[in-house]
A protein has these predicted regions:
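Short His-Asn-centered micro-motif
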Residues: 79-80, 118-124, 129, 145
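Non-globular targeting/processing and membrane-anchoring segments
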Residues: 2-114, 131-137, 141, 148-237
Length: 237
């Protein structure tokens, strides 16, 4: 086996020197953790917006309201899943990037233990959703907002722009007080990375995400962002 080192690799050092460098990085990592804790504390204190409009979705067992999606719990995390004619693979498949996100949602028992439910919502008809959900092997609750104002009201279906084709993914958080519902938080774009393990794991590796925007050593493999994302059964074997 060849031991020749690539010119683009970082310095190769003895274990004690590596430990010293690692400890310096750890100081910064701990500072970042404390900053994120402080940010989360601010997020918990954001003002909330009441949701007075009645929304009804198509679920696997019939019509369900936004209140029903809480399943009796106080909190609801809702992923706005892109699934419309502007999405690659329509009408048989949902957005590849959104599929990557849902692949990373773990067993919901852990959220339920903290009085929190999770659901995905798409504007696609329920039949399309069922087909893609079965193909992907998911158990995550997923309902259809087809024929409702839900996507438009929450800014997820809009007029096309130079940045998107008219449908946008995102993550909303709702809070229930009795039968009153409030929207407490929303994020989209890179904010959604917070719920994904793929990006966090890749960030721990020497190559990183291997995307062109990253500051990596010269010669490290990089491709345009998003373009490498596929539905999990579409990657080259």
């Amino acid at each position: 086996m060849s031991t020749k080192r690539s010119k683009s690799m970082p310095r190769i050092v003895p274990a004690d020197e590596w430990q010293t460098a690692r400890k310096k990085l750890l100081v910064k990592e701990k500072a970042m953790t404390r900053s994120l804790d402080a940010l989360a504390a601010e997020r918990r204190r954001l003002p909330m917006v009441p949701i007075d409009k009645k929304y009804v979705f198509d679920g696997p067992d019939g019509k369900v309201s936004l209140l029903d999606l809480f399943e009796g719990r106080r909190q609801l995390i809702l992923y706005h899943f892109m699934f419309s004619p502007v999405v690659s693979g329509w009408p048989s498949a949902g957005c590849p990037g959104c599929s990557l996100v849902i692949d990373q949602i773990g067993h919901l028992a852990h959220l339920h233990a903290r009085d929190t439910s999770f659901v995905a919502v798409s504007i696609a008809p329920l039949a399309n959703i069922k087909k893609h959900k079965k193909r992907m092997g998911w158990t995550v609750p997923w309902v259809s907002s087809f024929g409702t104002d839900f996507n438009k009201d929450f800014g997820r279906t809009t007029e096309p722009t130079d940045k998107h084709d008219g449908e946008i993914f995102g993550l909303s958080v709702f809070f229930r007080d009795g039968k009153r519902i409030y929207r407490s938080y929303f994020t989209d774009g890179r904010g959604v990375e917070a719920i994904g393990t793929v990006w966090q794991l890749l960030d721990l590796t020497p190559f990183g995400r291997q995307e062109k925007w990253e500051d990596s050593p010269a010669g490290w493999p990089q491709t345009p962002p998003f373009e490498w994302w596929e539905r999990h059964d579409e990657y080259p074997k």
